[in-house]
Amino acid sequence: MERQVAAEAQEKFRLCRCPPDFYVMNKLLRREMLLRLGLRFRERVCYEDVEYTMRLLGEGGVLVTVPDVVYRYVVNGASITKSRQTPKKQQDKYLAHKAFVAYADARGIRLDARFRRITRRSFGRWGLTWLKIKEFGDRETYRLFDLIPVWRKRVTDKQACDGH
């Protein structure tokens, strides 16, 4: 990657490949900017990096990319993100991605349709996903093996907030 400068939110999201990559560990940040934006990671929430990164790119000022590797990091195999999915982790991920879509819409950031299909819940056993519930706008689709749509229904904002 060559050195690039971007000030527009749409271009910053594109350069950072966000979505789907909401990584915070591949960005160097100025302390003053973090203080100005009041950015903090929320505690006891998984996928908090989605909220953090969307605000960072959407409100953080100019983005400069650099062509060189600046630092390296190691992925912890025992980390929360590498551990087994739980209903709480799935709910946190759903809420984070739903908030991102709302944030993008409020700021006029164009999203590919595939990033508007949000997985609400997955059910699986033995490494096989047998049912996945996906939301797209005001519709929920239940998909067998994440391939075959078997049920669709319209959802209200209250149902989406309650997780039903």
Task: List PLM regions with ranges.
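C-terminal subregions of glycosyltransferases and related glycan-biosynthesis enzymes
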Residues: 23, 72-164
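Generic macromolecular interface patches on structured domains
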Residues: 63-66, 110
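Donor-binding/catalytic cores of nucleotide-activated saccharide
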Residues: 1-64, 74-88
